[in-house]
């Protein structure tokens, strides 16, 4: 199992491609690319990201982890 990611981009990089991440999460390629670029995932995608991360064997991706990343991105914006 992979360790807890250090950032949203590090999380997305656990997949071979952004397209693969997008497919697993159920969003479009451009939405996934913007998530990576902005270091932020919209709350509407959190449940799917948590489930997809679990299937990938990525530890530590929880609602709390995503909320911290979301808050950090909001402060930086």
Residue ranges and their predicted role:
Residues 26-41:
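Recognition helix of helix-turn-helix/homeodomain-like DNA-binding domains
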Residues 38-51:
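Short, basic-rich loop-to-helix N-cap that marks the start of a DNA-contacting helix
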């Amino acid at each position: 199992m992979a360790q807890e990611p250090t950032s949203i981009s590090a999380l997305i990089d656990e997949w071979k491609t952004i397209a693969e991440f997008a497919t697993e999460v159920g969003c479009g390629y451009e939405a996934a690319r913007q998530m990576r670029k902005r270091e932020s995932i919209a709350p509407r995608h959190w449940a799917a990201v948590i489930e997809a991360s679990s299937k990938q064997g990525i530890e530590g991706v929880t609602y709390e982890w995503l909320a911290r990343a979301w808050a950090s991105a909001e402060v930086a914006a």
